[in-house]
Regions:
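N-terminal alpha-helical interaction blocks
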Residues: 1-77
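Short, basic and Ser/Thr-rich N-terminal targeting/leader segments
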Residues: 32-33, 43, 93, 100, ...
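Phosphate-interacting basic helix/loop segments used at nucleotide- and nucleic-acid interfaces
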Residues: 85
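Cys/His-rich Zn2+-binding cysteine-cluster or related metal-binding knuckle/ribbon modules and their
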Residues: 88-97, 108
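Residues immediately within or flanking Cys/His clusters that coordinate Zn2+
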Residues: 93-96, 103, 113
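Cys/His-rich microdomains that often coordinate metals
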Residues: 103-106, 123
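N-terminal strand-loop-strand
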Residues: 110-156
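Extended serine/threonine-enriched, polar tracts that run as long, contiguous segments within proteins
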Residues: 160-162
Length: 162
């Protein structure tokens, strides 16, 4: 039987286990979950994503809810990329329950696509191509700080390609 890795979200927060030196993704759910999806396999691990059922979940010692963006500095890069994909799959499922053609219920067809039970319309998560521009002068880079940033973050200039 293959081992599992569970990317569990609650209001945009990712459940992480702090083992004292590093953070890791839980190997099994620690509370009631909903919208469980198998979204891949990596290093002989089955990758699942789901949402926590409760608004306020009392966590066992060593577990924390951490924002996906904040987890960037806490998780190894491959795990962070998997967490991003897990979040995308949940978003896709939440926002594509019904067919845009006939209004019937959509069912999962593949790990990353849904198909209408009535008309056969198949959809995949939308790709939004973005461009990031580095504005620099010598060794200095132009960064921006938006009022909407909750913490002391600076970002590059970015925009979407139409």
């Amino acid at each position: 039987m293959k081992e599992e890795r569970h990317y569990i979200f609650n209001h945009g927060q990712l459940l992480l286990r702090n083992n004292g030196q590093t953070y890791e993704i839980p190997r099994k759910p620690i509370s009631a979950i909903k919208n469980l999806h198998l979204f891949g396999e990596h290093d002989n691990l089955l990758l699942y994503t789901s949402e926590s059922c409760a608004n306020e979940v009392e966590l066992p010692q060593g577990y924390e809810w951490i924002g996906l963006r904040e987890s960037f500095n806490l998780l190894p890069r491959p795990i962070y990329i998997e967490a991003g994909k897990a979040s995308e799959i949940l978003y896709f499922d939440t926002h594509h329950q019904y067919c845009g053609i006939c209004g019937a219920h959509m069912e999962w067809h593949t790990p990353i696509s849904k198909r209408c039970e009535v008309c056969g319309e198949e959809i995949w998560p939308q790709l939004n191509t973005a461009i990031i521009v580095l504005v620099h002068r010598g060794d200095e880079a132009l960064l921006v700080k938006a009022k909407s940033f909750r913490r002391n973050f600076y970002g590059l200039l970015a925009g979407f390609v139409e």
